[in-house]
Curated annotation (Swiss-Prot):
Keyword Signal (UniProt): no
Annotated NCBIfam families: PRK04950.1
Chain residue ranges for the region called Disordered: 101-155
Ranges of compositional bias, category Basic and acidic residues: 111-125
One GO BP annotation of this record: post-transcriptional regulation of gene expression
Disulfide bond residue pairs: none
Organism of derivation: Vibrio parahaemolyticus serotype O3:K6 (strain RIMD 2210633)
Chain's role: RNA chaperone with significant RNA binding, RNA strand exchange and RNA duplexing activities.
This protein's name: RNA chaperone ProQ
Keyword Cytoplasm attributed: yes
Amino acid sequence: MTEKLKNSKEVIAYIAECFPKCFTLEGEAKPLKIGIFQDLAERLNEDEKVSKTQLRAALRQYTSSWRYLHGVKPGAVRVDLDGNPCGELEEEHVEHAKATLAESKAKVQARRKEQAQKAREEGKAKAKPAANKKPQQPRRTNKPKVQKPTKPVETRALNADEITVGNAVNVNMGKGNMAATIVEINKDDVRVQLANGLQMVVKAEHLRA
């Protein structure tokens, strides 16, 4: 089964390959014969790669491109699919192309201006809070203080159902217990977070209530 072309860009490339004397992909485009869609539809009627709907959309894109509109100028001659001349352009068509081109360029310029303005505003918004910040003091490289174990208090071993993430526990440090919160459980290994923010991995048997 023949694979259909996916988008107008592919369709334009395909018809330029089929009719190189009429359609071009680079340089100034030639004005097309009035009613050329019908000619295209008839010539590609049996072609499974492209549908009439795709042809119509591709032609619309091709004839509204700046490259094509630049080619619609006084003295230019329309061509058919085989590159044969089909009459000189009428003045009203030239004027229409000129107006369309100017309008299209104005829209692009306005859009670029709007995007540039937006980028400037975003840049100012980011710079303003930074300017208001006080100079940061040099960070000290001292190691974080480890919380000293508290004096032994009367505790008991945890039951299995008490070893759950988020539970407040005491960690038996030998000389005393340290308050902590369970953050992760991996079989017998339990990761806890001490009150000072430090995390450590201990055996479940070292946890007390």
